[in-house]
């Protein structure tokens, strides 16, 4: 039953994704071109990729945690994640270089649009007492960093397949030249910023 529901969700998400991509190409890009006086079409700000990271410090002592969370992340991202490993040994944390310490997935193209639309319209509104995300999490290059406290707010996650709530970090990498362009790009694409935060 769950698998049937998941397949149905993927079909709906695919349709939504096509709408977001279409919206960017037909509406968002044109508004950005006009507002920022962009002459070269290739210079119009766009989302380049979305990177999702989950830190699993306890995975070094329990391989089952890594396997279970790999399934969770793969389900919510729509793509198989890669394992991140410690680059150096840290005695204080009993960490050895090469040990598995997390998972990461990088989304581009169709899967990227699919994930963003789901994030903006389905996932974030499910956060308790949600009033919008901060517009203060951009870097100087217009990339946005978002931290979520738990993976269970994603519709693909089955409660039976989680050992405990785990946070994840989402980075939306853009081609924007600065913070202002990055903010406007995501606002037009539907990022639910705190009301009145943009240009306020």
Label the model's feature ranges.
Residues 13-200:
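Ribosome-associated RNA-binding proteins
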